Structure formats: structure tokens, C-alpha cells
Amino acid sequence: SGQIQLWQFLLELLSDSSNANCITWEGTNGEFKMTDPDEVARRWGERKSKPNMNYDKLSRALRYYYDKNIMTKVHGKRYAYKFDFAGLAQAMQPVQADPSMYRYQSDLTYLPGYHPTKLNFVGTPINPSTNASLFSSHSSYWSSPTGANIYPSGHVTHPHASHMSSHIGTYYG
């Protein structure tokens, strides 16, 4: 998502030593401590335009990261957490496309930097309301007699649906 995530916000605070009054690194293994957890929560609430944010709510959000292997609680230390940078890097990986949605792998070779094991394609849904404006202008070019009959047989071929991703049907038809 385009919105800042809590873990990104915490790293942002930790990257500036002037925030040591509320959050600071402890050691070199990704461990950090909230020296003023209420202030960290207040700043997070300010950033997200949520004035009712408090440490209880922020810590609930942090617990969500445990299952995602993004961070863990440091046992025996109050307000201490540890980033799992390997898990964080894994969580940041884009969704991998299913190569079977293409009829031939050679169809993908035109993509710059394409490598079968490093395919980072994410399909973007098409919004019909924005596309309508692309075709709604009636310029003299398209209304000319030669432009009106660009397909002499009047037939347009369509790709076979068998190799298309199943979500395409929700946008067309």
C-alpha cells in the first residue's frame, strides 16, 4: 500500500538520533527500546491522523508483526522489540506471477530484465471509468472515411480466454 506502515515509521524514528528521548537502538542486532512508548504512540497517531492512538493500540499492531516474522518482543525487557530483517526483506517481496497464465514463456522475453525465476509482474486492474474518457473524443481523424474502416472484414480477433488470468473476467464483459 501507499500508506506508511508502522514498521517503516519505527525505522524512520530510529534513524534519527534526536528521537532517542522516545525510541532508541539497543545493540547491533535490530533490537530497539521505546524509552517513551506513549510519545511513540502519540507520534504514530499524529502521522496516521488518529488522535486516539495510544501504546496499547500500537502494541497490538506490533503483535501482528510477530506472525509475519517482521519483529519479535524481547523477553524480559519492557518496551523492547527486535526487528527480524530477514523476515522483513521476505515480507517486502512482491507477489510472484503464475507463469502458467502465459501461453509461451517466450511471450515474456520482451520484458526488460526478464528472467524466469525473477518475474515480478503484478497485474493492475483497469478502471473502466478512466478509460472511457480515452475513447470519448470525436476528432475528425477517427470520423474520416478511411479511419472508419480499418478492419475491412469487420472482424476483430480476441485472444483465447484459456490462458488469461481468471480475474480478467471481472473487468470485461
Swiss-Prot record:
**Keywords, in A-Z order:** Activator, DNA-binding, Nucleus, Transcription, Transcription regulation
Q: Name one GO cellular component term.
A: nucleus
TM regions (residue ranges): none
Query: What residues are annotated to bind DNA?
Result: 1-84
Disulfide bond residue pairs: none
Any one Gene Ontology biological process term? cell differentiation
Q: Name one GO molecular function term.
A: sequence-specific DNA binding
Q: What is this protein called?
A: Transcriptional regulator ERG homolog
Q: Which organism is it from?
A: Lytechinus variegatus
Gene that produces this protein: ERG
